[in-house]
C-alpha cells in the first residue's frame, strides 16, 4: 500500500500530475503508455475469465486488418480496450498527417466500440481510451452473445480475444447465433457474432483455441462452413 504522509507531499503529487496533462499528442502517448504498463502489473484475469492480450500480439493483429480512418472498429469482449488502443496507435502512425477534421472527430468517438460484462473492466477501458485521445468511445455493459445484443452489419473491423471459459446459458443466447452454430461454447458463438456484426467486406482478427480449427462436432463444422 502506498501512503501520502503529509499535505505537502499531496500538493507536490497534484502539481506533478497537472504538469502531465497537456493537449500535446506526444504527452498523451506517454500517459497512455504509462497506464498500459500499470495495467500489465495488475492481476491478469478479470472476474469472467478475460485475459489481457500481450501488446505485440495485439499490434500484429491490427497490422493484419489494416484499419483506416473511415472504419468502425468493435471489440465485443473488450476487457481493458487493448485492441482498440492498438488500432488507434496504428491509425496515428499511418494516417496522422493526412486525416481530415471530420476523420479526427470520428476518431475521437464513434470509430471505437467495446462491450464487456465486467463493470470494472469497462471503467478501466474507458480511462485507457481517454488517455489515448479517444474522448467519446462507445463503451457499454453488454453480454455480446445474448439476446440484448441485436447489432447487425454495423462494423467494418472486429478485433477480439473472447473468453473461452466454459459455456453460457442456452436460454440467453441470441437466436441468430444459434442458427449459425447450435452450441453454448463461447468461442464458437463469438465467431458467429463477428459474422453478424460485420458489414459485407469487413475484416476480423480473433484469437481462438485450437479446437475451433480442428473440432469435429456439428457446431464446429457449421461455423467453419460459414
Give the role of each language-model region.
Residues 198-204:
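Short glycine-dipeptide loop
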Residues 213-214:
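Conserved BB-loop
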Residues 1-42, 50:
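Long recognition/docking surfaces used for binding and targeting
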Residues 15-18, 35-43, 62, 66, ...:
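Amphipathic, well-packed alpha-helical segments that form the structural scaffold of globular domains
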Residues 189-193:
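Short, conserved SAM-binding segment of the class I
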Residues 50-160, 165-169, 176, 184, ...:
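Conserved S-adenosyl-L-methionine
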Amino acid at each position: 500500500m502506498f501512503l501520502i504522509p503529509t499535505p505537502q507531499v499531496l500538493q507536490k503529487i497534484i502539481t506533478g500530475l497537472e504538469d502531465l496533462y497537456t493537449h500535446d499528442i506526444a504527452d498523451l502517448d506517454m500517459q497512455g503508455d504509462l497506464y498500459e504498463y500499470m495495467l500489465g502489473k495488475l492481476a491478469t484475469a478479470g472476474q469472467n475469465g478475460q485475459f489481457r492480450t500481450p501488446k505485440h500480439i495485439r499490434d500484429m493483429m491490427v497490422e493484419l486488418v489494416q484499419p483506416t480512418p473511415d472504419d468502425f472498429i468493435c471489440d465485443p469482449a473488450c476487457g481493458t480496450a487493448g485492441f482498440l488502443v492498438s488500432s488507434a496507435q496504428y491509425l496515428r502512425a499511418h494516417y496522422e498527417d493526412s486525416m481530415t477534421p471530420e476523420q479526427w472527430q470520428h476518431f475521437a468517438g464513434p470509430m471505437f466500440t467495446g462491450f464487456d460484462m465486467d463493470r470494472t473492466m469497462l471503467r478501466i477501458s474507458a480511462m485507457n481510451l481517454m488517455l489515448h485521445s479517444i474522448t467519446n468511445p462507445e463503451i457499454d455493459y453488454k453480454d455480446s452473445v445474448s439476446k440484448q445484443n441485436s447489432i447487425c452489419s454495423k462494423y467494418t473491423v472486429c478485433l477480439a480475444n473472447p473468453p473461452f471459459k466454459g459455456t453460457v446459458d442456452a436460454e440467453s443466447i441470441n437466436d441468430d447465433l444459434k442458427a449459425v452454430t447450435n452450441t453454448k461454447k463461447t468461442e464458437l458463438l463469438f465467431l458467429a457474432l463477428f459474422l453478424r456484426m460485420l458489414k459485407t467486406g469487413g475484416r476480423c482478427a480473433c484469437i481462438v483455441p485450437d479446437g475451433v480449427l480442428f473440432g469435429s462436432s456439428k457446431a464446429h463444422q457449421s461455423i467453419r462452413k460459414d
